[in-house]
Every structure is written in C-alpha cells, then in structure tokens.
C-alpha cells in the first residue's frame, strides 16, 4: 500500500495545488480502469486524492477540436523531450485521458500521487505517453508504467528547471511544476554562463524546500551557498521575456 506523501515542513497559507496530466493512447482503454491501490500507488489515507478526476476525449467526437485543443498545443514540447517520431505519433493519436485536480493549500500530496497512479494504470493499459502540463514535460508511457507504486516523492520528477539566454548574454533560470504544491515558481536572472550548474543546484534545492511545504513571500530573504542573501520579489514577465511562466512566480535577486 502506498503511503501518502506528507510535507515535513508544511506552512499554512499557501495557494491551491493543481495538477494536470494528459495521457495519449492509440487505442480505447478500459472503462472503468482497473486501478489498484497496491499496484498503482493510489494512497488510501489522503482526502486530497479524492480531488482527482479523469475525463476521456476522443478524436472521433470532434477531430478538429481534438487536434487544435488537445494535441497541437503540446507537439513542440513532445518533440523536444521525446523526439520528432513520438511527436508525430502523438499528433495522430485517437484518445486522450485528461487527469486533473486542485486542492486548497495541500498539507499532503495525495492529489499528486493519485494523478500519477491513474497515469500509471493508463500506461499499463496502452497509453503511449503522458504530458505533465504544469511541469511542461513529456514522459514515455513505458516509463510511467514502470513507476514504483511505493516510491518516495522525487522532486525532479515533478518540477522541471529551464535555462535560456537573455539579450544581455546572461542566463535566466526558472522552475515549472511548483503549482502542483501551491507554491509560486522561482526565477533567477543575470546568471553568468559559467554558473549554470551552480544555479541549477540552487534552484533545485529551493524547489525541494517549497515542495516540502515551506513558503517564500515577497520581501523574504533566501540564503545561498556563497554567502549572499537573495530577496524575493513578484516576477514581472516583461522584465525577462525569455522566461515562460503562466501564473504566480517570484524572482530572487
């Protein structure tokens, strides 16, 4: 039986945690799904798991809408993560299974576990890939099917770190996926190219702290290994157009 993922450093007052996964399949999958708490990792001691819902979308119902609204928005992401052949197969898929849920200020992460439990079951039944919408990442179906049902939370499975070059020649770095945990995304700017690895580790560690339940508010300070103290501010997308974030975000300066 899967133990619910609890947040060891949970601090109340956060936002709602939302997750959205889209599983694509070339074939119609069983309804109802043969979901097993033991086999798929569905937690049984979390009310948050009950917030997750599954909706089926079939290409045959409205082919143009299916392509425009379900598949095409993620084609570039799938191609980048999994290659052009997988992206081409995704564009031709016949069925999409949308897993969604939202929990107010989640004290445990049962909603995240439940979503992946459904995705694992779908992939065992024939889904070929899963898009993690808020983390902007695509996973092969065979990899999702292989997820251990009793695994511990792995932050870097749930959160993606991105880097891009700015017009000034420096780097911008940001997270995607913290929305699942009711926390703002984190942005770091004006990074020297030779500090990319160091910055990735810092961003990973900050993300892990937020996933564990800590909060960062505008005006809060965050200590970094080199002794500096960065201060959190609301992120203005116009200040760094290369940063692609929808929703709440903080920049640390």
Q: Language-model features: where?
A:
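Internal, hydrophobic cores of structured domains that mediate oligomerization or house catalytic pockets
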Residues: 63-164
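Structural alpha-beta junctions
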Residues: 39-49, 117-131, 208-217
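Aromatic/basic-lined ligand-recognition segments
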Residues: 134-253
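Short acidic, S/G/P-rich loop/turn micro-motifs used as interaction or catalytic elements
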Residues: 28, 103-107, 192-196
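N-terminal low-complexity, intrinsically disordered segments
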Residues: 18, 24-88
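Active-site-proximal structural scaffolding
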Residues: 14, 112-115, 199
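Short cationic amphipathic helices and targeting signals
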Residues: 16-26, 96-99, 186-190
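Charge-rich interaction surfaces and accessory domains that mediate macromolecular binding and assembly
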Residues: 2-28, 36-37, 234, 243-245, ...
């Amino acid at each position: 039986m899967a133990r619910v993922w609890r947040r060891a450093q949970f601090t109340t007052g956060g936002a709602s945690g939302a997750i959205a996964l889209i599983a694509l399949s070339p074939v119609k999958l069983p309804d109802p799904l043969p979901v097993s708490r033991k086999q798929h990792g569905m937690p049984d001691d979390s009310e948050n798991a009950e917030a997750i819902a599954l909706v089926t979308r079939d290409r045959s119902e409205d082919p143009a809408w299916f392509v425009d609204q379900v598949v095409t928005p993620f084609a570039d992401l799938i191609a980048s993560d999994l290659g052009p052949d997988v992206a081409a197969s995704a564009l031709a898929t016949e069925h999409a299974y949308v897993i969604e849920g939202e929990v107010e200020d989640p004290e445990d992460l049962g909603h995240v576990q439940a979503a992946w439990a459904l995705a694992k079951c779908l992939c065992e039944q024939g889904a070929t890939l899963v898009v993690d919408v808020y983390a902007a990442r695509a996973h092969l179906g065979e990899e999702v099917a292989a997820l251990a049902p009793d695994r511990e939370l792995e932050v870097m499975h749930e959160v993606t770190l991105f880097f891009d070059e700015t017009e000034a020649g420096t780097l911008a770095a940001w997270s995607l996926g913290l929305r699942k945990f009711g926390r703002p995304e984190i942005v770091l700017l004006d990074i020297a190219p030779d500090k990319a690895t160091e910055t990735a580790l810092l961003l990973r560690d900050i993300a892990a702290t937020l996933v564990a339940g800590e909060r960062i508010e505008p005006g809060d300070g965050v200590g970094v290994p080199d002794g500096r103290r960065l201060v959190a501010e609301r992120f203005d997308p116009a200040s760094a157009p290369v940063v692609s974030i929808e929703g709440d975000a903080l920049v640390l300066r």
